[in-house]
């Protein structure tokens, strides 16, 4: 039912809609992993899969700059894509289309201008038998889109900042990033997860509060002689669960991402 509601306003003739439909059908066959799966043998995933989790936010939560700026790289000018509870916040973001595309994924997925790029790179290198990758492909709506053209070296790093406002309980967030570095290009990216509430959550301080479950998927395509430094910082609540699948396609002369 959540999938049908999610796709209610979608273009049913789009390639992205086809990907979502195929992914949810495959997920329904496979389901969530259990201890029989080698990679999940020692991870009790059922403990974080609460039946009350939902992909739908009730409202947008506005955050003061004084709180957001604490999560920025100190003293460094950067491009920024800020996502609060999975929703893009244009107020505190700094995106661009000058020389490179550094913006939100939703702005390109259904844009005819980017159709060739999306058909070439989007959802091409994921494991289509991995449960959480399928779940992300079914429900992801927002994230970062970064495309650095041939021989372009970015003048400053990129920050992808995920913030849990604490204003909503029981959210299952599905961030999706698509990153493309063409031949001879260079970029530095820092992806981080933070929370505005402390680690002292209890049924007494936040009655009925259920920690968000973040299921992130990132596709990275690095062409010949391109150079990518990619950093991940997970500094959310101790009780928050983050599932992160990062898929990288390196063409043969590309140095490995650091």
Name every feature range the model reports, one short phrase each:
Residues 91-254, 258:
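Conserved beta-strand/loop scaffold segments within soluble protein domains that form the structured core
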Residues 1-134:
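N-terminal amphipathic, basic helical "cap/leader" segment at the start of enzyme domains
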């Amino acid at each position: 039912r959540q999938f049908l509601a999610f796709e209610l306003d979608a273009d049913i003739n789009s390639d992205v809609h086809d990907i979502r439909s195929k992914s949810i059908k495959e997920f329904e066959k496979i389901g969530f992993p259990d201890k029989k799966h080698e990679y999940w043998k020692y991870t009790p995933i059922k403990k974080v899969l609460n039946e009350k989790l939902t992909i739908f936010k009730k409202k947008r939560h506005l955050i003061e700059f004084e709180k957001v700026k604490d999560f920025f790289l100190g003293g460094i000018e950067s491009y920024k894509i800020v996502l609060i509870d999975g929703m893009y916040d244009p107020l505190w973001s700094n995106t661009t289309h000058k020389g490179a595309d550094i913006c939100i994924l939703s702005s390109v997925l259904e844009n005819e201008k980017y159709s060739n790029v999306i058909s070439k790179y989007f959802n091409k290198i994921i494991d289509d038998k991995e449960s959480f990758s399928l779940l992300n492909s079914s429900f992801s709506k927002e994230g970062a889109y970064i495309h650095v053209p041939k021989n372009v070296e970015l003048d400053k790093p990129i920050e992808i900042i995920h913030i849990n406002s604490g204003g909503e309980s029981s959210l299952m967030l599905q961030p999706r990033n698509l990153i493309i570095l063409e031949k001879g290009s260079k970029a530095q990216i820092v992806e981080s997860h933070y929370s505005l509430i402390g680690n002292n959550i209890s049924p007494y301080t936040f009655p009925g509060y259920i920690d968000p479950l973040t299921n992130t998927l990132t596709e990275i395509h690095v062409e010949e002689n391109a150079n990518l430094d990619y950093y991940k910082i997970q500094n959310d609540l101790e009780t928050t669960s983050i599932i992160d699948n990062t898929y990288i396609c390196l063409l043969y002369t590309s140095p490995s991402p650091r």
